[in-house]
């Protein structure tokens, strides 16, 4: 927007603000109800917001937990696709759902870093890596807002576990905040989200909703955000302090806040200028909403369903395959596990989606693609038994499944978590699958050497008790309402899997950056600093079950002809990628920067670029990347900005963080 346009808009906002009384301006700073702003008898347009990142959750008298809605793959599945276009298309589809429901702002996406795999909301978040999270979130927002529906980027900031999230302070140092936890927000801000939502938790002892260092100094001054900041629902503790920190709209309506603001003005805790600045930002948002009306055109339902299916397929990660996949021809395969019939489409809490209709069973979807095959189904466990101390009928189910597995060519076990075990407000107590599921996997593995385990979960799970006893492992995540169609497509070979892990799968909880610690209820120190996710495992040379960026295919890819050219603007990296197999497929080329020497402790390597490349069998393609000076930088607490240290850097190209195929070096002068 030009300076002239900005000034014109400012004058219009001033005229609109002049129509509001002093009390109306204060009332504008808190919502009119649960999810909408004040209109003052038609003086202002109403802004309506709704959850959530995987599909709409709109509560009604008839549907108190949310009216039936279309369910899309969860954000972590979009990140596992490693394809920003997938996230953009899902954003466009979600915008269509909002348009039909009269929603102006979707309360998504969340870009909080997956600091611990136990966090109950990890399924809502993209990655343990800020670059991958930021890139995917930016595309999600671009898609959503291209159709005239605003995004609410959340939860700013350092909201990385659900346990005691309302009270426990995240004690994080400035460098760690800027390099890891604020970084995905900074990248997503390139998409100009309409709003940003603050977190519930305190940061360095001050609630995020009223933290001037966090909202004013970091978000607005350092990151350059000048839009509306809204609260998470019930996150405001002192409305005047929140306003002083530049929080604009409190959700939901809080009757006491009006008196709090009046008292704040009387006592000088806030100034009228603070009110006017916030009102101006809100009016600009309302005007943006009105101007977006002409872009609000919903996609056809059939197109949205295809987007959901494509995203679920592309986000599936093949973790192990001893040759049993893809399934072919006249084959008899036992399909076991209640989740095969009643899949985990998404997690619980505000991101929960009430399905329009139950997904088609996995056995039925496999039969469609392999009509000569047989796919008998046995539960083997019921999910209620996984959460109760006694499961009296469990042994009978396992006995039947054992016999069926013995009589089959292969057996598929669908295991994982659901909306009760991965949900807002609670963290998981363990990385392990429910014991009944592990027992079923091990029992079938004793009867059949071709056991295929499908895992539906929103974050890493501990597979060590059974991973080496099965023939294949497929990580589907929470794939939305099309999850079984997507799974059948991959298992049958109709789709070649191309997903990669957006987080490390550790060998044990004690190996993770946070270990088994979770704070004391009052505060939690981010002692690992910038060594989040794979940075931690690589720095300490820890073995992992599956590394960040890992994922198999039904074909093979070769990397060759590496070129690294240093330029005034940074560096140009290129290589040749070849599909060396007999099946078309896609590979994610990942570029990591490795500082050889540094004045501060730095991660061994960090992701700085990636591209998903689709190749026919035998096809080759030249893939190029541009690295900027900022890709070599770290945050200096001395200068309070990102700086580049002079010295030698390695540029690594690979198929995962631990599968480096090509390597080059360059020397930078740096800032000092």
Predicted features by range, described:
Residues 1-637, 643-658, 672:
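Glycoside hydrolase catalytic-domain context in secreted enzymes
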Residues 660-664:
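Extracellular and select intracellular beta-sandwich modules with Ser/Thr-enriched
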Residues 665-671:
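Short beta-strand edge segments in extracellular beta-sheet folds
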């Amino acid at each position: 927007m030009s300076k002239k346009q900005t000034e014109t808009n400012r004058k219009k906002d001033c005229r609109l603000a002049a129509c509001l009384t002093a009390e109306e301006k204060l009332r504008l700073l808190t919502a009119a109800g649960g999810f909408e702003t004040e209109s003052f008898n038609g003086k202002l347009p109403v802004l309506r917001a709704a959850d959530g990142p995987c599909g709409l959750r709109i509560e009604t008298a008839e549907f108190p937990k949310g009216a039936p809605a279309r369910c899309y793959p969860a954000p972590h599945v979009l990140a596992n696709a490693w394809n920003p276009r997938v996230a953009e298309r899902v954003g466009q589809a979600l915008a269509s759902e909002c348009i039909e429901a009269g929603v102006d702002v979707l309360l998504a996406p969340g870009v909080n870093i997956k600091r611990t795999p136990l966090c109950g909301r990890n399924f809502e978040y993209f990655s343990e890596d800020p670059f991958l999270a930021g890139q995917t979130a930016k595309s999600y927002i671009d898609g959503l807002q291209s159709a005239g529906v605003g995004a609410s980027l959340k939860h700013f900031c350092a909201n990385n576990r659900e346990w005691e999230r309302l009270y426990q302070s995240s004690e994080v140092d400035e460098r760690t905040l800027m390099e890891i936890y604020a970084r995905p927000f900074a990248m997503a801000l390139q998409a100009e989200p309409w709003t940003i939502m603050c977190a519930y938790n305190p940061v360095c002892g001050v609630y995020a909703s009223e933290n001037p260092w966090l909202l004013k100094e970091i978000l607005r001054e350092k990151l350059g955000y000048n839009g509306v900041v809204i609260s998470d629902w019930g996150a405001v503790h002192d409305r005047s302090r929140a306003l002083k920190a530049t929080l604009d709209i409190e959700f939901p309506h809080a009757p006491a806040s009006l008196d709090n603001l009046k008292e704040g003005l009387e006592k000088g805790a806030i100034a009228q200028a603070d009110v006017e600045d916030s009102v101006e930002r809100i009016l600009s948002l309302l005007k943006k909403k009105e101007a977006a009306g002409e872009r609000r055109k919903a996609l056809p339902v059939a197109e949205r369903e295809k987007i959901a299916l494509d995203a679920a397929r592309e986000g599936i990660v093949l973790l192990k395959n001893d040759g049993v996949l893809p399934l072919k021809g006249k084959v008899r395969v036992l399909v076991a596990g209640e989740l095969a019939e009643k899949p985990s489409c998404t997690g619980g809490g505000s991101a929960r989606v009430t399905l329009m209709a139950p997904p088609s069973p996995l056995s039925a979807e496999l039969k469609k693609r392999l009509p000569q095959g047989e796919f008998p189904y046995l539960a083997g466990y019921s999910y209620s038994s996984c959460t109760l101390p006694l499961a009296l009928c469990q042994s009978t189910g396992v006995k039947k499944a054992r016999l069926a597995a013995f009589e089959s060519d292969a057996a598929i076990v669908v295991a994982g978590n659901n909306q009760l075990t991965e949900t807002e407000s609670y963290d998981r107590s363990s990385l392990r699958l429910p014991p009944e599921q592990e027992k079923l996997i091990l029992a079938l593995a004793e009867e059949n050497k071709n056991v295929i385990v499908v895992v539906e979960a929103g974050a890493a799970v501990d597979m060590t008790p059974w991973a080496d006893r099965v023939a294949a492992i497929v990580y589907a995540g929470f794939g939305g309402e099309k999850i079984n169609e997507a799974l059948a497509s991959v298992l049958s070979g109709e789709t070649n899997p191309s997903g990669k892990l957006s987080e490390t799968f550790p060998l044990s909880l004690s190996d993770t950056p946070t270990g088994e610690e979770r704070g004391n209820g009052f505060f939690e120190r981010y002692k690992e600093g910038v060594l989040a996710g794979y940075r931690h495992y690589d720095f300490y040379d820890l073995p992992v079950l599956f590394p960040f960026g890992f994922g198999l295919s039904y074909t093979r890819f070769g990397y060759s002809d590496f070129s690294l050219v240093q330029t005034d603007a940074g560096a140009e990296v290129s290589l040749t990628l070849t599909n060396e197999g007999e099946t078309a497929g896609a590979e994610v080329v990942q570029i990591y920067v490795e500082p050889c020497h540094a004045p501060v402790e730095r991660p061994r390597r960090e992701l700085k670029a990636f591209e998903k490349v689709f190749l026919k069998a035998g096809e080759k393609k030249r893939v190029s990347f541009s690295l900027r000076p900022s890709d070599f930088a770290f945050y200096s607490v001395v200068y309070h900005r990102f700086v580049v240290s002079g010295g030698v850097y390695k540029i690594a190209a690979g198929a995962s963080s631990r599968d480096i195929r090509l390597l080059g070096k360059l020397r930078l002068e740096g800032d000092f």
